[in-house]
Amino acid sequence: MTNLKLTTIFVLFFCINIIGFIDRHLLSAFGSQIVAELDLTRQQFGLLTGFAFVAVYALSGPVMGVLADRHNPAKVVTVGVLVWSLMTAISGRATSFFTMLAPRMLVGVGEATLHPSATSIFTKWSGVGSRSTIFSLFFLGGHVGVGLAYWLAGTFGDTLGWRQLFLLLGSVGLLFCIPLWLFVAPLVARSNQTNDKPLVSRPSVTQIVSDLRHLLVSSTRFRIAVLGFALVHVLYATNQFMQLWLSSERGLADYEAASVYGAVYLTVAIPAGLLGGLMADLFIRYFRTTKYLFLVIVLLASGPLLIALRYATIDTPLFQIGLVASVFMITFPYGAMFAAVIEEVPARIQASGTGFILFACNVLVIGGVTWGVGALSDYFQTTGLTQPLSRALSIGDAMTLLAIPCFWWLHRHQTQMMQITQPANDAMTDSNSEQK
């Protein structure tokens, strides 16, 4: 496999990842318009942007992973892109909550094929030393996609409207099926036939489930790490309401709200996503400490700005800084956070551990909290409270900050373990030196 072909395949998957995240967040970017046109409650909107998509996406992920392992992963993702692109186009014809709900759920099924299939292909065709870079760049496409969703809604929503953009996005997705099926799938098939990178023997499904269950029961560190990781993902859920919040309670025009948030997201997320992992590694090496302390410092520095955002008026610097913090807080520490949590999982079941972690974040947190914020906002509105969405989002922000004590406990525990093991390691080093 030549470097040119590998680069072409990577760029193709990178672009598909961008398309997937645009599709995932375009509904949120047009929140106020879709809520008004389809006569949705905020609870229903929270279901569409959260649980309806996320639950199906997370539950389908393990199944798609098995299919990608047993069959040609390029063909699996081609079918997935075909399904989600068609459903995206159909979403543009929705006339009610239920006619939007069904295609959004099927979009989740289709998009669940991408990451397992891409992981299968990239792992087989890349060396260990380059995988971190490859996956960091690949997941960067998600940040680009989120920002582009809001930018597209703000820039072209007024002229094209949300229905036409959904149809256009679905059409673009369908075009990617052609090179996937005709170019990537044959290359994957030939690579498997020549056994350039033979598969390693894997434990049985029963053994994997048993090991994962044992990890959950026996490892307090793993449970707290997953809890902290999941709590930070509450910010993903609250950010689903950003366009709706900016337009309904901060006075921005619908398309201006989407455009402003899209511009901020792109400006902050790309450099933050690229530099966060590098800064974490430098911090750990320089201070000889843990990743968890880095996470605590980042969350402590940006958390108060997030809380202040909900109460700042739109013409103040505090509002602008808070808006930046809402993006920075999830994108800058994400690489270090994921690496820290996955290090709590034994190497033999890291793929299954990753699946469980993402399931917990997507279904229990992003899906559940998105629905909860919408329902709470509706309740506050019925009681006559002012700024009901701001109040509901503030509760979500407070939940995000509960990750800080989780990461602090993990830092203290890991530091104590290092202090216990370091003298033993030093003694062993001295003994080896004397023998020499």
Predicted regions mapped to residue ranges:
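Juxtamembrane intracellular "pre-TM" segments in multi-pass secondary transporters
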Residues: T2, V188-I224, E249
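Extracytoplasmic gate region of multi-pass secondary transporters
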Residues: S28, T220-A269, G273-L274, Y334, ...
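Extracellular/periplasmic helix-loop-helix junction of adjacent transmembrane segments
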Residues: F30-L59
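Helix-breaking motifs and short loop linkers at transmembrane-helix boundaries and internal kinks
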Residues: D39, N72, R93-T99, G127, ...
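Conserved MFS/SLC helix-loop-helix module at the cytosolic interface between two early adjacent transmembrane helices
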Residues: L59-T95
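Cytoplasmic membrane-interface "Motif A"-like loop-to-helix N-cap segments
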Residues: R70-G80, L282-V298
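Cytoplasmic helix-loop-helix junction between adjacent transmembrane helices
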Residues: P103-G142
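Helix-loop-helix hairpin linking two adjacent transmembrane segments in secondary transporters
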Residues: F138-V188
